[in-house]
Amino acid sequence: MEDKKTALLITYYWPPAGGAGVHRWLRLSNYFIENGWKLHVYCPENAEWPIIDNELQKQVTSDLTIIRKSIFEPHKYLGKKNNPNVSGGLTRNSKSSIIQKLIIWTRGNLFIPDARVFWIRPSFRFLKKYLNEHPEITTIISTGPPHSLHVIGQKLKKERPKIKWVADFRDPWTDIDFYQELLPGKWADKRQHNLEKKCLQEADEIVTISDNCAEGLSKIGQRKVEVITNGYNFPYFDEEKIDLDSKFTIAHFGSMSFPRNPEILWNVLSDICKENSSFKNDLLVNLIGPVDFTIFERLIIHQLERNYKYIALVTHQESIQMQRASQIMLLVANRTGNVKGILTGKFFEYLGAKRPILAIGEADSDLETAMNLTQCGKFISYDDYSTTRTEILKWYDLFQENKLECNSINLDMYSSQSLAKKYCALLDSLL
């Protein structure tokens, strides 16, 4: 049986790609070999990733077999090359123009399931031959988004019915919170739902990252969905002690799109600044990553223009160091529909930094559950001014006394090593 424990991972995000999409499988893959699984990783060679982070290539273990194939990316012809603000199509540089709306409509109606649709056919042909040359591969794992990769998996499964196929959903498909922003017409919407249902019903196993997300996928596919959350790697954080920021820093890492605007926080910070000159002098909001232009407008309206710092892009290693030095980590869930099941990789990375997390989102969500389980900070509903103010003032008092700490618990269950063991056990059950 041992010589049969080889899997093929089909992924779009792989180093030197940076950003949120790469970390789930980069981390899990590190521990597959110790659980008895060899992994072949199929990824694009010349992709138009919105973020490049060459440092991540150092985290790729030598026991992986990496296969790269060129990909046609329509984004390069739409003026989006290497612009981190188009990640997910949610953050904007300025007010939407007719051209921008046309680009979004094109994406939502012509590129189905997504802009990587042109990689499906050549990948299927290439991997069909590759599987013939590597009969030891018994299992395929497709991870999306982009969900075009699930279509590749579905085609390979149809071609080789005996092979096992696991569809790994890092985000929902048609239930993703920005789906309607893509302006899908009736034909496109029907096509998306048909593809989604087909993949969900034909895969041997469906895996996703949270309970609410699993519930949504289960309803669509009419089947059980396994939950294996994102996680983090302990070694990246178990380094020498880092000096904390001298300012009372509230740091947000990653994309802050318009639906993630933490308006209640700006209200609270603005009011306290007006009442307390010491607080105003100490406060610094660090925004690291793509930020929608409306966020800056709101900061100015709340007279916080001198209390924030914007850094467009840092490497993953730099972000880890900055997280560990921050006084407070800010995590905001999109204020849109279907957000209860979104438990992002950012949350787990914040856990590893072991600094207090201020999470703003929807009540009874998977994020609130995880916050309560780990006791890593404070979860606050979107419009809860009183609790937000109380927590900020409490943390500021502790900051002034050099006693602001995070005493989180139950972290082992979210380590990439533990999650990889769980994933490999699932793969074992398919053999």
What would you call each of these model-derived segments?
Residues 1-75, 205, 225, 272, ...:
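N-terminal subdomain of nucleotide-sugar transferases
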Residues 282, 287-289, 294-320:
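Nucleotide-activated donor-binding/catalytic signature segment of Leloir-type glycosyltransferases, i.e.
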Residues 243-260, 266-270, 419:
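Conserved donor-binding/catalytic core segment of Leloir-type glycosyltransferases
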Residues 125, 148-151, 155-159, 173-174, ...:
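Membrane-proximal helix-turn-helix segments that form the acceptor-binding/catalytic region
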Residues 44-121, 130:
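A conserved catalytic-core segment of Leloir-type glycosyltransferases
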Residues 260, 315-322, 329-348, 356-369, ...:
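Nucleotide-sugar-dependent
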Residues 75-80, 232-247:
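Acidic anion/phosphate-binding donor-loop and adjacent secondary structure
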Residues 212, 231:
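Carbohydrate-associated surface elements
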